[in-house]
Curated annotation (Swiss-Prot):
GO molecular function, one term: RNA binding
Pfam families reported for this sequence: Ribosomal_S9
Full protein name: Small ribosomal subunit protein uS9
PANTHER family in the cross-refs: RIBOSOMAL PROTEIN S9, SMALL RIBOSOMAL SUBUNIT PROTEIN US9M
Highest taxon in the source lineage: Bacteria
One cellular-component annotation, GO: cytosolic small ribosomal subunit
Keywords, sorted A to Z: Ribonucleoprotein, Ribosomal protein
Sequence similarity: Belongs to the universal ribosomal protein uS9 family.
Length: 129
């Protein structure tokens, strides 16, 4: 029985994912998916997407630790980590995951604040007179 480790990232959220062959148990921060997310069905589907695409929702166990960011960023980091772990588990899954963009790290992060500006791009109000 081999244990596969992968990390997923999105904005400031980081997901550490361990994948093992099993019965389809999903543990996130020592909680089930429903306890961790509550009633957010759209975010649940986002997390389950790589498992559903590869038809592995009943054949692998996933244990994950997620921190940083908000729920949406954490869910996308988790999806990225699960996709990378599935790719390492069986290279044939790459053909399914890659076209959907699930193996690609979303590099969009918050732009830094610049001096002389109020925010990243917002300038102080300009007055001609």
């Amino acid at each position: 029985m081999r244990k596969i480790y992968a990390t997923g990232k999105r904005k400031t959220a980081i997901a550490k994912v361990w994948l093992t062959p099993g019965k389809g148990e999903l543990s996130i921060n020592e909680q089930s998916l429903n306890q961790w997310l509550g009633g957010h069905e759209a975010i649940k589907m986002k997390v389950m997407q790589p498992l559903l695409l590869t038809k592995q929702e009943q054949s692998v166990d996933i244990k994950a630790v997620v921190f940083g960011g908000g729920y949406s960023a954490q869910a996308e980091a988790l999806r990225h980590g699960i996709s990378k772990a599935l790719n390492a588990y069986d290279i044939a899954f790459r053909a399914v995951l890659k076209p959907k963009g699930l193996l690609t790290r979303d590099s969009r992060v918050v732009e830094r604040k610049k001096y002389g500006k109020r925010k990243a791009r917002r300038s102080p109000q300009f007055s001609k007179r």
